[in-house]
Every structure is written in C-alpha cells, then in structure tokens.
C-alpha cells in the first residue's frame, strides 16, 4: 500500500518538480510561489491528493456553517466529500418539512389487498350479520325503552299537566261566577249538572275553588272544581237549608287536587261557602281518616261517625285516600256557626 506522501514545501525554486514528476507552476499555483499568496477563497482549502491516496484519506471535520446553515464560513463550497453533502442535503430537506419515510406497517396497509374469494366473502358477510339472540335482545331493549318513555309521559301528564289545566279551568269558572254576581244575574233555585253556584274557601289551606252541581268526573271534578252530592240516592242539602248535611267531593291528587291537604285541618278551623247572597261559615268538627267508598252513611243528615248528636246544619268533605289511590275515602265534617249576608261584608274568617 502506498503511504501518504508529504507535500513539498513551496519555495522560491520554481524550477523544481513535484513529487509526481510535474514541475511546479507559476507563482500563485499550488507548489509555485508561496501558499499564502493563493486566492482568498481557497486559503482554507486542504491540499489536493492524488488518486492513489484517496482510500487512505483521513476525513476532515466539516467546515463551520453560517448562521443560516447554508454553507461554510467564507462562502466556499461544502467540504467533507459527497457523503457529507448528501447528509447535509437530507438534513436541509428534513428541516423544510419533507415527509418522512413511511413505516413498514403503513406501507403494508396502503398496499393493494388481494380480492377475496366467494367463500371468504360469504364468511365475512355472515360474521358481520347479527345473530338471532342479538336481534332479540335489541328488540326487547327497544320495547323496554319505549315503555319507559310512555310511562314517564303518562306520569308527567297525570301529576303536572292535569293540575295546570284544571287550575286554569277552575279559575275561569270562578271568574265567570263572580262576574255574574257582580252584574246582578240571578241564579235559579236549581242548577244543571256541572253548573257552578258557589265558592268554597278553606283559609288554612289557601284554597278557593268553585262548587258545581253534581260529582261528574268529566264535567266537575276533573275540571278542578268540587262537586255537590245532588244525585238520587246521594242527594244532600244546600247550604241555605234550615237543617241538613251539605256534602262535597273533590280530588286529593291530580286535576287541581283541591282536597289534597284536608287531613291537616283541625277542630275549629273555618270552612266558608260563598254564594250570591250570603256567606256560610262552618267550623271543622271531626275527621274520619279511612273508610270504605261504599260507606254512604257519612252523607246522612246526621252522620253517625261525625260525633253530632242531633239535626243541624253540617258540611261534609269527601276525598280519596291514601294519596295517588282511590282505594278508600277520607271524611271531614264541619258545623255551621254563622250565616252572614254579603251586604254586611266578608266574615272574619276571610278578613284575617
């Protein structure tokens, strides 16, 4: 192997030959004149080597780059050979956002797939198709969801919307009744089923509700009013009767629920019936928390379980119990303590 040959020092002897048998050139060329007198752009360039020493060349460190990273200081070409230049070019392309080489997995995914055979296609189609158990479970789940939504809507209708509608209807009926009284329109001695003729006040419960003839659910109770027992077999007295029991029915839950809290009444609490001409003031006397719906004796002129001992002017309030059911009935009784003409103003129970 040929060893590295040291370069001859350039001197003044311009007639001496190079180590390769070539004469030194003129002043300013490599080997002719002084090396310091070479071109300014080539002052840092390493000495050229012949082809025989390329394999043994010691790689030179890369030339320092400028701030922009585009070349060596001094504006000269990149050093380090073609391999270094290729690496520098790759680095520059990477900094400029060139796409990276795709991973083998991505290349495999992008590679075209071979078409499936008919058997494989049918097998995949059967695998994607849900089984009978899955279809049945989905159908049952949809049925349960639909049933739950319908039940929620029904509960919302019963507990909220029926009250909203019944309150509006009852308020309108009370307003119409008061307008008729203010205009001097006289009420007949008897009333049609569903016709309002009085107002019921329960101050402790903040209840003011129209009283209509009959206990029809459609015409009276479901419209937020309370009904007067006036049908044959359950006919009760009117408030202006000299003796008798004035029987009323009302909802405890839903449809305005005017009697929802009558279980909170205590003996002595006032119950007032307002008509076109008079106020009839009753005092709560007793309560029967639970009784059968068929116990119609609670509407007798002198109810046996009320504690009254003889004929008098009584009032009976009936409603369902427990709440949200109609299995039993709750009964509240009261006794009249004052009959006051409207010309004398409101009774104390409505003023205080």
UniProtKB/Swiss-Prot annotation:
Description of the deletion phenotype:
A single srtE1 deletion, has a significant delay in aerial hyphae formation when grown on minimal medium, but no delay on rich medium. Nearly wild-type levels of ChpC are attached to the cell wall. A double srtE1-srtE2 knockout grown on minimal medium has a more severe delay in aerial hyphae formation and does not make spores, on rich medium initiates aerial hyphae formation later than wild-type and does not make spores.
Residues passing through the membrane, by range: 140-160
Primary residence: membrane
Which SUPFAM superfamilies does the record cross-reference, listed alphabetically? Sortase (SSF63817)
Q: How does it sit in the membrane?
A: Single-pass membrane protein
Compositional bias, Gly residues, is annotated for 71-82
Quote the CDD domains the UniProt record gives: Sortase_E
Tell me the Pfam families matching this sequence: Sortase
Q: Which family does it belong to?
A: Belongs to the bacterial sortase family. Class E subfamily.
NCBIfam families tied to this protein? class_E_sortase, sortase_fam
What is the name of the protein in this document? Sortase SrtE1
What organism does the UniProt record list as the source? Answer: Streptomyces coelicolor (strain ATCC BAA-471 / A3(2) / M145)
**What gene does this protein come from?**
srtE1
């Amino acid at each position: 192997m040929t060893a590295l040959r040291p370069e001859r020092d350039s001197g003044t002897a311009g007639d001496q030959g190079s180590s390769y048998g070539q004469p030194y050139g003129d002043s300013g060329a490599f080997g002719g004149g002084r090396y310091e007198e070479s071109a300014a752009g080539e002052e840092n360039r390493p000495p050229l080597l012949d082809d025989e020493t390329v394999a043994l060349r010691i790689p030179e460190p890369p030339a320092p780059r400028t701030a922009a990273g585009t070349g060596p200081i001094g504006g000269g070409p990149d050093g380090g050979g073609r391999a270094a230049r290729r690496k520098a070019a790759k680095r520059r392309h990477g900094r400029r956002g060139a796409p990276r080489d795709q991973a083998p997995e991505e290349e495999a995914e992008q590679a075209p797939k071979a078409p499936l055979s008919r058997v494989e296609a049918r097998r995949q189609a059967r695998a994607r198709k849900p089984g009978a158990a899955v279809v049945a479970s989905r159908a049952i789940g949809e049925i349960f969801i639909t049933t739950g939504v319908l039940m929620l809507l029904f509960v919302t209708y019963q507990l909220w919307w029926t009250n909203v509608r019944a309150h509006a209807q009852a308020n309108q009926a009370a307003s119409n009744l008061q307008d008729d009284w203010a205009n001097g329109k006289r009420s007949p001695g008897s009333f049609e089923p569903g016709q309002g003729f009085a107002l019921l006040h329960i101050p402790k419960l903040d209840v003011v509700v129209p009283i209509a003839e009959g206990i029809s659910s459609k015409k009276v109770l479901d419209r937020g009013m309370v009904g007067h027992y006036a049908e044959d077999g359950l006919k009760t007295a009117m408030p202006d009767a000299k003796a008798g029991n004035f029987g009323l029915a009302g909802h405890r839950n839903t449809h305005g629920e005017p009697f929802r809290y009558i279980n909170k009444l205590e003996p002595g609490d006032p119950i007032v019936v307002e008509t076109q001409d008079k106020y009839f003031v009753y005092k709560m006397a007793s309560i029967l928390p639970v009784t059968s719906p068929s116990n119609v004796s609670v509407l007798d002129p002198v109810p046996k379980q009320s504690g009254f001992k003889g004929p008098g002017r009584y009032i009976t309030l009936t409603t369902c119990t427990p709440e949200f059911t109609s299995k039993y009935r709750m009964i509240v009784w009261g006794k009249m303590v004052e009959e006051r003409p409207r010309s004398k103003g409101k009774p104390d129970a409505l003023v205080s």
